[in-house]
Amino acid sequence: MTEAEQDKTIRAVLAAYDLPGHISGITRLVNGHINDTYQVQLEEEDRTETWILQRINDYVFKDPLLVMNNIRAINEYLDNQLDANDCGVIHFLANRDGIIYTEYAGGIWRLCPYVPNSVAYEQVENSQVLVSAGYAFGRFQALLEGLPMERLAETIPGFHDTPARLRKLFDAAE
């Protein structure tokens, strides 16, 4: 896809949302390995908002709608588990049709607020990053303990089999 086609597609997807202002910048974020991700700036008068727009990779996720349904189920569950003192959970913005994704040009797109000062690591520079990631993953697993698994669909075979994934991780670390 050319840059002009990419720009046209992104603008068409964003038109499905009730967003304030006009698009003042679109930057493709190249770190990350799965989805096509863009940082979008919107300006209205003297205010700028930053959003993250993603196209879900339908090669990795054969049915991207299952991914979005899982996210919706997890968000609904966590919204009832967390209080105001807990860390936030990313929510995808509903489009004008009230859906948390937009279908366009054969792709499934989703939009969420940009998290200021967020970092995506391509490589880990110190062990504290790994400790923090492990803590966050463990906390996430603990928070989901009461979520009925039948509410989630299998998006990748074995993806939700945490013991098997941990065995693979430990095997790879040896």
Where are these regions (language model features)?
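Juxta-kinase regulatory segment immediately upstream of eukaryotic protein kinase catalytic domains
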Residues: 1-27
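Conserved ATP-binding subdomain of kinase catalytic cores across diverse folds
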Residues: 25-43, 47-174
